């Protein structure tokens, strides 16, 4: 091997195992192709060649590099307006607000709760006039409810993952039992992209793709689709053992292609929780639900560096951690770190204390 080292990329989405201890390295996969690339050279050169192989990230919208605000648990339009006003009235830069699942009707994807979020289009427009873009969360699970149009379409057109018996896979997530689009099928990706058109016409500036490992609420077993779930896999066919790691990547691809089709004049912004090699072609990433502790901050730094070394350069975290109540010092240090990352967002769980900067005292502000 060359003196400068090398980068090894195994092009296999199946579950893998690696043992890098000692003098030898061992890598194995539970199925899939045995196809790999060895890229020699110093780290920066090898990484550049890897990114050219898996795909370069596109130029982002300029506003995305500014400060973003989000919070799970903003139950009404008025709560969101109050938070945005709090930043603007204090002269604190705010470029985007992210709406979590609270804006949906019963957590049904592609819906808006008109009672709690009336005239969402007007809200998006009002924020835009103040220089604040709106980003909406989307989950892949489609509520398995008779009469719900996306579910009925999915059944009629064969868009959902199925068991070997032919039965649609259903699993518990936010709206209750849900079915899961098979993003390994080009037909499904096109359908999903069409579903974004209405939001884009409203002026929505980006989408936050969550729960797309895909994740399920499971009391036991793996919190995802069963290994036997069937996927199209671009016409080759196969089960979830090959499709699992591709699911988030292909949901991002479907969203990107829909964005480009229905808002061709703009640069898409997508944020994803899950992905695979090449996801940087479509989406940014954040580190997910990290605990609000010093160890959580250290783990976040490791994750951000690891993502960057995997070609996913546009990354960030939930400032202060997602779950818990950071001390003023931890909050401030996390903020300082996050200001140097491409994705700069304050976000937290609904059970945590409010943590807008002015809530933690004058010294922090």
Q: Which role fits each region the language model picked out?
A:
Residues 1-365:
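Catalytic-domain carbohydrate-binding cleft regions of carbohydrate-active enzymes
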């Amino acid at each position: 091997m060359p003196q400068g080292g090398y980068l090894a990329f195994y092009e296999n989405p199946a579950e893998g195992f690696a043992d890098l201890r000692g003098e030898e390295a061992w890598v194995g996969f539970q199925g899939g192709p045995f196809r790999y690339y060895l890229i020699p050279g110093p780290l920066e050169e090898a990484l550049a060649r890897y990114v050219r192989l898996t795909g370069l990230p596109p130029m982002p919208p300029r506003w995305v590099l500014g400060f973003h605000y989000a919070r799970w648990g903003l139950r009404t339009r008025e709560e969101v307006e109050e938070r945005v006003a709090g930043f603007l009235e204090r002269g604190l830069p705010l470029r985007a607000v992210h709406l979590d699942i609270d804006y949906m009707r019963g957590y049904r994807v592609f819906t808006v709760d008109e009672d709690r979020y009336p005239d969402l289009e007007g809200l998006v427009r009002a924020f835009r006039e103040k220089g604040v873009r709106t980003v909406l969360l989307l989950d892949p699970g489609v509520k398995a409810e008779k009469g719900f149009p996306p579910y009925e379409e999915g059944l009629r057109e064969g868009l959902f993952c199925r068991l070997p018996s032919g039965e649609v896979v259903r699993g518990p997530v936010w709206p209750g039992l849900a079915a899961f689009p098979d993003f390994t099928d080009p037909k499904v990706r096109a359908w999903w992209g069409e579903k974004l058109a209405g939001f884009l016409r409203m002026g929505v500036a980006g989408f936050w793709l969550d729960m797309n490992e895909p994740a399920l609420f499971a009391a036991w077993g793996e919190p995802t689709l069963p290994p036997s779930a069937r996927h199209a896999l671009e016409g080759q066919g196969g089960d979830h053992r090959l499709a699992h790691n591709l699911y988030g990547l292909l949901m991002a691809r479907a969203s990107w292609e829909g964005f480009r089709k229905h808002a061709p004049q703009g640069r898409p912004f997508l944020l994803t929780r899950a992905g695979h090699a090449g996801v940087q072609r479509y989406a940014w990433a954040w580190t997910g639900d990290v605990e609000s502790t010093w160890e959580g901050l250290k783990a976040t730094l490791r994750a951000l560096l690891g993502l960057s070394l995997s070609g996913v350069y546009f990354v960030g975290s939930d400032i202060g951690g997602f779950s818990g109540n950071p001390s003023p010092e931890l909050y401030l240090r996390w903020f300082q770190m996050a200001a140097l990352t491409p994705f700069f967002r304050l976000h937290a769980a609904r059970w945590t204390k409010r943590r807008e900067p002015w809530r933690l005292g004058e010294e922090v502000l």
